[in-house]
């Protein structure tokens, strides 16, 4: 089963099937601030060392998992429905929603389409900055 493909022009790995057998992770940051972020926005952020200067919760075994993570929720008040840009943590039915993850150097982009709404979220740690955008 194919889960994604390389885009040589953009230098990205594109995951278009979120039902992976295990977490596929991207490492963001090159200096003091760093993050491990997987294909469903799970992961954690740390400063210098993940064991002592973590900013988000650290799981020493099994990291990264789908939770904790970096999630953006979108809610439709009229329909009383909501979803997340990444497949987790809401995990909408894949027959009704489309999710895609693009791991690049040094960023990750999450894209979704649900109920007529297309959304995207870009995660990056700019070189020389101690911030996750």
Predicted feature residues:
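Anionic coordination/interaction segments
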Residues: 1-133
